[in-house]
């Protein structure tokens, strides 16, 4: 993973979304704007969500494309949206949405690092208290290693 996975340009603190769909679109749009994925990757994120929910627990959802969507991934990357107001994710409250695009099997490494971080409730609380994209990048920066 030579390219940066996460940058302040793909992090939004105090993000707003009225629905799960708006949140997925926002996460996907950040990946497109940064050049990580082709625009139709966002459609594949929605397709994945219809197959299985990307809600993981602890206020976290990790929308990502289907297996077929790998063709639309230019570089592995991640977008992070932190919401003050919870987003209804099929009846679950989500406050952090992490959009993921992985080249080859790199998404598995990214997912593993995120899962470890979010398995600790105090880490989730800390992330929710951060005020800037720079602070979020410092907190989640290990995904770039």
Curated annotation (Swiss-Prot):
It is found in: Cytoplasm. Residues 4-143 form the PTS EIIA type-2 domain. InterPro entries: PTrfase/Anion_transptr, PTS_EIIA_type-2_dom, Sugar_PTS. The active site is at residue 64. GO terms for cellular component: cytoplasm; plasma membrane. One of its GO terms (molecular function) is protein-phosphocysteine-sugar phosphotransferase activity. Its main location: cytoplasm. The modification Phosphohistidine is found at residue 64. GO terms for biological process: phosphoenolpyruvate-dependent sugar phosphotransferase system. The PTS EIIA type-2 domain is phosphorylated by phospho-HPr on a histidyl residue. Then, it transfers the phosphoryl group to the PTS EIIB type-2 domain. PANTHER family: MANNITOL PERMEASE IIC COMPONENT, PTS SYSTEM MANNITOL-SPECIFIC EIICBA COMPONENT. The phosphoenolpyruvate-dependent sugar phosphotransferase system (sugar PTS), a major carbohydrate active transport system, catalyzes the phosphorylation of incoming sugar substrates concomitantly with their translocation across the cell membrane. The enzyme II CmtAB PTS system is involved in D-mannitol transport. This is Mannitol-specific phosphotransferase enzyme IIA component. It comes from Halalkalibacterium halodurans (strain ATCC BAA-125 / DSM 18197 / FERM 7344 / JCM 9153 / C-125) (Bacillus halodurans). The lineage of its organism: Bacteria, Bacillati, Bacillota, Bacilli, Bacillales.
